[in-house]
């Protein structure tokens, strides 16, 4: 006798291809939702582990997390591999860049696109795909039959006794009995492609992920390091910066993760060895009261754990009086997307701050003995050589050389599908036709020397990283290269006393085209995928490494 309902549970593989050196919140959060719904979920972070071929071949649903441009480019190289290994599973892409590139992704065979607040929609989709309804209540095992919902007009039915396994079939284990139901095509998407619903977030389920010590770590003055955890206290953003990839999806909306959930997530990571937490919020001060209450509770429970946050220059000025609260609760540094020191470029980007605002904030941080990590989109269609030299001079004048990762000085503006930059009339003459493979509107500076400087700076940054050169040493090389390109003698570099600052071992990127190093990694990723398929066909595959 069987005294309970039988549900068909999905075998789901959640995949991350790139997330700034962090354990991806966009994987561990939906993992909690899907597991709570009863599904069998495997989580793969391909920046830190091999492709689990057993999980891939057994999967009925692949869901690939696309939080940014580089992750999307890598996913595009991965999808053919997944298809080769398991062409019966349904393919879903979710995250910020999924709806922005929906047409391209569907052309690769992706059946479902989810963006914004995606957890609930992903669960709904898994339930629809599997026809998750009670199929049996009581009675004799010999009477049991499996009934599926209609999918694409085909009703699948299988009898438990003697049913055989087939590719793309879902199985229910009831004692020794297996019921097979062909998944097939899920049909037209009915789930919201972009959901901005207010969700009651669950505690992220980090089971099965690589250990946090395998991710980016904190480099502290003196050469030491700390294990870093990461979480999110909010998603989306209430601002509408023209170049920001959040805007086409969230359109000025942001959503809060409940404080108790955030603290519980920090708690489980501290228990796993984290001594520093990196908050991945697009802007930690979007909800200022939420932020202040959170850091106060954070510090009460974890007085020896430090953290970092990302906050707009505009908010650092508006809430200047709250900076002390950050310092007193263990904030080691604040990342801020300065982007440019040219007010005309800042106006085009609709950043909400000026050059003077940035300088004011930099000096305020120094006054408070706090650390600011400014990031830049140093190269845009409007960048001039003199403008670039001006940026370098400001960094020197404000004693920020040690605060700026060299790679930040070579970043090029990313113009993806849906970018608000395309609203500017002048863009018609500045960008080329959308490149569906590169996922950008390509552009070149009218002064070819500027593009050459960008390439040179990226090469210097990559070399400096490889050789473990100091930031000041790399900056000196960039200083010389930029002046040489401009055809002027480089003034003697007068660096201030400077001081060593804490920073994460993997640089922070946003609104940027992939760097040279990232493009190399994308090519290597594709090559590994191709080799994995060839080995698997030959019966000798041993993982995606």
For the regions a language model picked out, list residue spans one by one.
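A structural motif corresponding to the C-terminal lobe/cap of the Radical SAM core domain
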Residues: 288, 299-480
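Short acidic/polar active-site loop segments enriched in Thr and Asp
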Residues: 60, 111, 275, 332, ...
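Residues at alpha-helix caps and immediate loop-helix transition turns in enzyme cores, especially N-
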Residues: 26-27, 55, 74-78, 258, ...
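Acidic, low-complexity intrinsically disordered segments
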Residues: 4-263, 267, 271
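Conserved beta-strand positions
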Residues: 14, 64, 93, 279-281, ...
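Cofactor-binding loop segments of dinucleotide-utilizing enzymes, especially the Rossmann-like FAD-
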Residues: 17, 46, 96, 282, ...
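Radical SAM [4Fe-4S] cluster-binding motif and immediate context
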Residues: 210-371
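Radical SAM enzyme core and accessory elements
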Residues: 2-15, 35-36, 40-43, 55-61, ...
